[in-house]
């Protein structure tokens, strides 16, 4: 689980080496959506700082002299094709690291730092499967905020969310008093779901939350129509709201249910004939 959330920085071996400061040796199999990266955070929210969602990576390995200078293309990526290079830069220890455009899939991209782990005696990262949070205090406030909203108590919901935001905007409020504070008029189920992202991204099972609140189809549609990735292999496709809201019941469970017929969920039925 931990390695899935951490990009595969080790593939940039000229400039990067495994270390605790970058989350160890990840394999980059889980990504934040465009909505999370660009659509939900306000200025000054520490939950979006580079310490929590890392967007800039710095060289932690002194590159060899013949590897330190690279070409950069018009889009700001490392480019090997000289015809597309618009400038040359030399990277040293502590400088910003650049990657090829193709590497944004799993090597370098904005990511949550919650899952980083590194053991110098296990450089490859075999032991990065560790305890995971099931629930923490912040989620108790978010659940109560949702319950209060459903009871018609939007002010109570705002009060609960503001407890979290008093922490998230504490430093920024020194220059912008009141930053991040919400009122009853701000509260909706969409706002609460967004606040759950801001607070719990990478921790909760998001699909279950969206199923529980009846918002899975709406959120998938929003991702497809407004926040879709440019690359086909990064997009959501094939979602059918008539089928995919629920998951299939395993055939073994249906067969073991002897006293009554256990109906398969719609869309997953198998013809017995």
Show which residues each predicted segment covers:
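Elongated scaffold/linker segments in the mid-to-C-terminal portions of large proteins
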Residues: 1-136, 220-273
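Short, contiguous acidic/charged loop-to-helix segments that flank catalytic cores in large enzymes
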Residues: 124-134, 147-150, 178-184
């Amino acid at each position: 689980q931990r390695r899935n959330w951490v990009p595969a920085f080790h593939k940039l071996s000229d400039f990067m080496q495994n270390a605790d400061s970058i989350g160890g040796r990840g394999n980059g199999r889980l990504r934040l959506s465009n909505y999370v990266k660009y659509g939900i955070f306000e200025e000054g929210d520490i939950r979006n700082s580079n310490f929590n969602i890392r967007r800039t990576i710095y060289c932690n390995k002194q590159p060899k002299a013949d590897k330190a200078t690279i070409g950069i293309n018009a889009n700001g990526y490392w480019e090997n094709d000289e015809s597309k290079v618009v400038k040359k830069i030399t990277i040293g220890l502590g400088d910003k690291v650049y990657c090829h455009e193709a590497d944004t899939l799993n090597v370098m991209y904005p990511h949550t730092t919650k899952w980083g782990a590194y053991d110098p005696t296990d450089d490859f990262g075999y032991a990065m499967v560790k305890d995971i949070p099931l629930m923490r205090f912040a989620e108790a406030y978010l659940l109560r905020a949702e319950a209060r909203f459903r009871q018609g108590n939007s002010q109570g919901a705002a009060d609960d969310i503001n407890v979290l935001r008093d922490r998230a905007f504490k430093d920024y409020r020194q220059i912008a008093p009141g930053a991040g504070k919400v009122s009853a008029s701000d509260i909706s189920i969409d706002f609460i779901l967004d606040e759950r992202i801001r607070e719990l991204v990478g921790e909760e099972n998001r699909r279950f939350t969206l199923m529980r609140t009846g918002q899975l189809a709406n959120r998938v549609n929003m991702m497809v129509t407004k926040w879709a990735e440019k690359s086909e292999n990064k997009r959501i496709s094939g979602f059918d709201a008539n089928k995919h809201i629920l998951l299939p019941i395993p055939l073994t469970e249906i067969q073991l249910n002897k006293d009554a017929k256990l109906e398969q969920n719609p869309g997953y039925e198998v013809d017995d004939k």
